[in-house]
Amino acid sequence: DVFFYQADDQHFIPRSLLIDLEPRVINGIQNSEYRNLYNHENIFVAEHGGGAGNNWASGYHQGEQFVDDIMDMVDREADGSDSLEGFVLCHSIAGGTGSGMGSYLLETLNDRYSKKLVQTYSVFPNQVETSDVVVQPYNSLLTLKRLTLNADCVVVLDNTALNRIAVERLHLSNPTFAQTNSLVSTVMSASTTTLRYPGYMNNDLVGLLASLIPTPRCHFLMTGYTPLTVERQVNMIRKTTVLDVMRRLLQTKNIMVSSYARTKEASQAKYISILNIIQGEVDPTQVHESLQRIRERKLVNFIDWAPASIQVALSRKSPYVQTTHRVSGLMLANHTSIRHLFSKCLGQYEKLRKKQAFLDNYRKFPMFADNDLSEFDESREIIESLVDEYKACESPDYIKWGMEDPGEANVVAALDSKLVV
């Protein structure tokens, strides 16, 4: 009952809200086989149905307009929870609704529920192909500021890497949205198994995230999953062992973020923390032996200023989902190479900003009225500082980083008392 509650007729209803500024996607859900799954009172579609036009400022402004209606739904669900621990937001950072309205919701949740955790699953745009959204760099930068300041944990879902995995690992020449989304849903499902099938450890959101995020701002996680299959491969059977799964999780080709790259600079990056969630029939002694082998072979490069250990959580498999493999694994990792993804976003932003391109689209809205573009400048500074901090994490002297004033240590520790323990 973590993610569901029972209605009077005993069927289960998700504790979820579906929010959009245009009706196409939600109408698709309401006309599908899932139409009776969701609580219809928890579905919000803007009356005008015009969307945000792929404009962050439009989405943010409409978030201000509709915040009372949306927060009424949030408050109702929160009041119906026995022990509310936090919120999970699924959104994209490139368009208008997910980025703009998502940003406003992040700020509002952080303000109204300041003691609760906010975790996001954030879809980053494809960095290789030309985007249909010409203002994508502006939208991404403005959203990244909110993800840095208002979220406690961000699971990065990188479209560039997801497409690469679909092509290279699943051998799909032209992956569909449904096939890419199945990768995302696999990650989301696996990352919540310890909450849905609680054991002795990692059975709540704080316990899951506290060890992964030792410092408040470095809370962007990358994921890896193995073995990956698509529908047509369901009948393919192979032998899976704990060591095989844990070793594969560390391979670059299985990481779902493109910044975990094949460049020389990225290869010098380090792990801040790793949590492997292993599902299936597993003997704890196998886990211990696998960790020992990984340590002996020096397969992992950890930072110098924190414990260098891979944490492992064992979880049961769902009895309702049939799989052909005995053992599967998800890696949640805090890795300094994530900064290269942010640097790409900054680089794309700088190209557009130098040309002053498409800024009139933003000046139409209150935040950017009277040619006030300070929001862009502030967002850029925050993301540059985030990139610098991830770079500093690779140094043994990171603990002293940015602490010119002795009192600053206390300020940093107080930034996020929800996670820093």
Swiss-Prot record:
One of its GO terms (biological process) is cytoplasmic microtubule organization. InterPro entries: Gamma_tubulin, Tub_FtsZ_C, Tubulin, Tubulin/FtsZ-like_C, Tubulin/FtsZ_2-layer-sand-dom, Tubulin/FtsZ_GTPase_sf, Tubulin_C, Tubulin_CS. The keyword Glycosyltransferase does not apply. It is found in: Cytoplasm, Cytoskeleton, Microtubule organizing center. GTP binds at A94, G95, G96, T97, G98, S99, G100. GO terms for cellular component: cytoplasm; gamma-tubulin ring complex; microtubule; nucleus; spindle. GO terms for molecular function: GTP binding; microtubule nucleator activity. Keywords: Cytoplasm, Cytoskeleton, GTP-binding, Microtubule, Nucleotide-binding. SMART domains: Tubulin (SM00864), Tubulin_C (SM00865). Pfam families: Tubulin, Tubulin_C. It comes from the Eukaryota. The keyword Protein transport does not apply. Belongs to the tubulin family. Tubulin is the major constituent of microtubules. The gamma chain is found at microtubule organizing centers (MTOC) such as the spindle poles, suggesting that it is involved in the minus-end nucleation of microtubule assembly. This is Tubulin gamma-3 chain. It comes from Zea mays (Maize). The gene is TUBG3.
